[in-house]
Design a protein with these regions (language model features):
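N-terminal alpha/beta PP-like core and its mobile active-site loop of ThDP/TPP-dependent enzymes
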Residues: 2-340
């Protein structure tokens, strides 16, 4: 996943930027975000207003439930190869969305989740409703299954926070990020002398790459294999990966078993292992390309020992996603070598 478009350079805020929410929407536009899905809520009415009144702002997709909004963002990212945004109303909207956010986390999908909260100033709260809808740390609801979260408390902090969220969600392995903005921050006028920062100064980190020694070792093992099989997982995330896998399979003459978490290999290709029985059972070497769950396809073969044991070459980003809260990391698989 890479950023789309070239954000503008640093500039003083033009007259069109009057409110905090205007600056937030400007960042969405600079990031190349084309669509925003949400179930309307009062805690982000400022952002909603700026989306409606800013020419060229991301298109709005109205939803009846927050889980639908986040699920739309998940599907969009998988189809378009870039994130979209979903707006979530306060504590209750975030709670509604939590299951869909966990789905996106498990699916390694990039998305910008933007929530409203407060007012944090108790003097500005309406009786009852604003109190039960405000949390001390709202992100704690989903902190265990997002890559990063933040709640900037002034406009001087919003730009860097947004840039960090964008680079974090787009870096591999991908995942959702959550930003939370106080109602007052959105609806207050921009401070005098406000300079709108360029998020283009903060590029997405390059994806991890294996060491040359690991590549040479993998090549030696694959060339020596009698019945190599490629097991494909998240390697199909980008078009260039799709084409590279076809070239690798053809160079090795190795069938490819696509696990289906992404469309990694053309099912009509002669080396497609779709529906072909016995491939993994008879393989002497399996090259697993970013497969998180190996126990299902390989089963008891993971426990083989001796000269005829399966040689598993595990190339994966999964360890970089590891968190302590859920066991979505799957069983630890023994391998000849694990390469990131």
């Amino acid at each position: 996943m890479t950023a789309t478009g070239a954000p503008p350079a640093d500039r003083a805020a033009p007259p069109a930027l009057r409110w905090g929410s205007d600056a937030i929407v400007a960042h969405l536009m600079e990031a190349g975000i084309e669509h925003v899905a949400f179930n309307p809520g009062a805690s982000f009415r400022g952002i909603h207003d700026s989306l409606v009144h800013t020419p060229g702002a991301p298109a709005i997709t109205l939803c009846m439930h927050e889980m639908v909004a986040v699920s739309i963002a998940q599907g969009y990212a998988k189809a378009a190869g870039r994130p979209m945004a979903a707006l979530l109303h306060n504590v209750v909207g975030l709670q509604n969305a939590s299951m869909a956010i966990y789905n996106a986390w498990c699916d390694r999908v990039p998305m910008l989740l933007i929530g409203g909260t407060g007012p944090k100033s108790k003097a500005n709260r309406r009786p009852w409703i604003d109190w039960i809808h405000t949390a001390s740390v709202q992100a704690s609801i989903v902190r265990d299954f997002v890559k990063w979260d933040d709640e900037p408390h002034d406009m001087a902090s919003v730009g860097e926070s947004f840039a960090r969220a964008l680079t974090t969600t787009r870096s591999l392995p991908s995942g959702p990020v959550y930003l939370c903005y106080d109602v007052d921050l959105q609806e207050d006028a921009l401070p005098a002398g406000y300079v709108h920062p360029s998020i283009g100064r903060y590029p997405v980190p390059s994806p991890p790459a294996p060491a040359p020694a690991d590549v040479a070792w993998l090549e030696q093992r694959l060339r020596a294999a009698r019945r190599p099989v490629i097991l494909a997982g998240y390697v199909g995330e980008a078009p260039e990966q799709f084409a590279a896998l076809v070239a690798l399979a053809e160079a090795l003459g190795a069938p490819v078993v696509d696990t289906g978490v992404r469309h990694a290999f053309p099912s009509g290709h002669p080396l497609s292992g779709a529906g072909v029985p016995g491939l993994l059972e008879e393989a002497d070497v399996v090259l697993a390309l970013d497969v998180e769950e190996l126990q299902g396809p390989l089963g008891a073969r993971l426990e083989e020992t001796g000269e005829d044991a399966l040689q598993l070459l595990n190339v994966t980003l999964a360890p970089l996603k590891l968190r302590a809260w859920a066991h979505d990391y799957q069983p630890l698989a023994p391998a000849e070598r694990q390469v990131t």
